[in-house]
Amino acid sequence: NSLAISVMNQWPGVKLRVTEGWDEDGHHFEESLHYEGRAVDITTSDRDKSKYG
């Protein structure tokens, strides 16, 4: 929640989105933590890539 709140405070009206938390399709490298359910891919709701670090 703290990351989502930080996003909303930095950019009012923008929300944090989790796009993938478990990789079933093999899109990540072989040793990725996505295969253990210990990693997530995230974006912002406006999908503005200039906000990504």
From Swiss-Prot:
Q: Where does Zn(2+) bind?
A: 34, 41
Taxonomically, the superkingdom here is: Eukaryota
The UniProt record gives the binding positions of Ca(2+) 2 as 20, 23, 25
- Cite the GO molecular-function annotations of the record: calcium ion binding; patched binding; peptidase activity
Q: What does this protein do?
A: Intercellular signal essential for a variety of patterning events during development. Involved in dorso-ventral patterning of the brain and in early patterning of the developing eyes.
Q: What is its main location?
A: membrane
Subcellular location per UniProt equals: Cell membrane; Secreted, Extracellular space
Mind listing the UniProt keywords for this protein, alphabetically?
A: Autocatalytic cleavage, Calcium, Cell membrane, Developmental protein, Hydrolase, Membrane, Metal-binding, Protease, Secreted, Zinc
Any one Gene Ontology cellular component term annotated for this protein: plasma membrane
* PTM characteristics: The C-terminal domain displays an autoproteolysis activity and a cholesterol transferase activity. Both activities result in the cleavage of the full-length protein and covalent attachment of a cholesterol moiety to the C-terminal of the newly generated N-terminal fragment (N-product). This covalent modification appears to play an essential role in restricting the spatial distribution of the protein activity to the cell surface. The N-product is the active species in both local and long-range signaling, whereas the C-product has no signaling activity.
List positions binding Ca(2+) 1: 19-20
The entry sums up its family as follows: Belongs to the hedgehog family.
GO annotation, biological process: animal organ development; cell development; cell fate specification; cell-cell signaling; central nervous system development; neuron differentiation; proteolysis; regulation of gene expression
Q: Know the name of this protein?
A: Tiggy-winkle hedgehog protein
